């Protein structure tokens, strides 16, 4: 399973790391996703949820 929020769809993003000489090398920024137990179709399930979804109350832990 990919590290992607099942509620908001947040996932890692890619871009460039820039050195002092402005040389570019590829890098990724990981989304702040936590593995939590939530109710999915009335049953508890462990899924990845973003910290923003947890803070805003879009999902509740079981």
From Swiss-Prot:
Q: Which residues form a coiled coil?
A: none
Q: Which regions are flagged for Polar residues bias?
A: 14-26
Q: Where is this region: Disordered?
A: 1-28
Keywords of this protein's UniProt record, alphabetized? Ribonucleoprotein, Ribosomal protein
InterPro entries annotated for this entry? Bacterial_rp_bL28, Ribosomal_bL28, Ribosomal_bL28/bL31-like_sf, Ribosomal_bL28_bact-type, Ribosomal_bL28_sf
GO MF terms held by the record: structural constituent of ribosome
Q: Name one GO biological process term.
A: translation
Question: What Gene Ontology cellular component terms go with this record?
Answer: ribonucleoprotein complex; ribosome
Q: What domain of life does the native source organism fall in?
A: Bacteria
Keyword Disulfide bond among UniProt keywords: no
Family per similarity comment: Belongs to the bacterial ribosomal protein bL28 family.
Kindly provide the name given to this protein in its UniProt entry: Large ribosomal subunit protein bL28
User: Source organism lineage?
Assistant: Bacteria, Bacillati, Bacillota, Bacilli, Bacillales
């Amino acid at each position: 399973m990919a590290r992607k929020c099942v509620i908001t769809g947040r996932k890692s993003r890619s871009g460039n790391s820039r050195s002092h000489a402005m040389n570019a090398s590829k890098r990724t920024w990981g989304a702040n996703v936590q593995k939590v137990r939530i109710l999915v179709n009335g049953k508890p399930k462990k899924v990845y949820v973003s910290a923003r979804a947890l803070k805003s109350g879009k999902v509740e832990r079981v």
